[in-house]
């Protein structure tokens, strides 16, 4: 069975209550549930992990390599603009990934315009809200089939 890992970065545990005008009203639990259901329908195993700690996300990426995960969907959140270490972990395991952002990072503050991940990602989805996760998953399902 094919396996996908969804990684959520810092503060995404607050989705649903954190700045809903920017990030929407859906909780992380709701987003994960929708993704798991969509993957199940396609016969793919999907697991989700969220952490506010960079080291834990890096360890999850390392474990994904050991577990032979086929694809990663990642919303690095604030680590998008700061984490060379998380980028290096993704490069090291060589698992293809799609970078997702709920908001359009290019229409926000200037410091959010740079991503340490976009140039090594298979694709980037930014600004489509929670639909971005689903679109990433649908693209991966098509590729894995």
Swiss-Prot record:
Binding site for substrate: 75, 81, 88, 102-103, 112
Keyword Lyase attached: yes
UniProt GO MF annotations: 3-dehydroquinate dehydratase activity
Record SUPFAM superfamilies: Type II 3-dehydroquinate dehydratase (SSF52304)
Class of this enzyme: lyase
Keyword Lyase: yes
HAMAP family found in the cross-reference section: AroQ
PANTHER family to which the protein is assigned, alphabetical: CATABOLIC 3-DEHYDROQUINASE
Job description of the protein: Catalyzes a trans-dehydration via an enolate intermediate.
Family: Belongs to the type-II 3-dehydroquinase family.
Name this protein carries in UniProt: 3-dehydroquinate dehydratase
Organism name: Legionella pneumophila (strain Corby)
Name of the gene encoding the protein in the UniProt record: aroQ
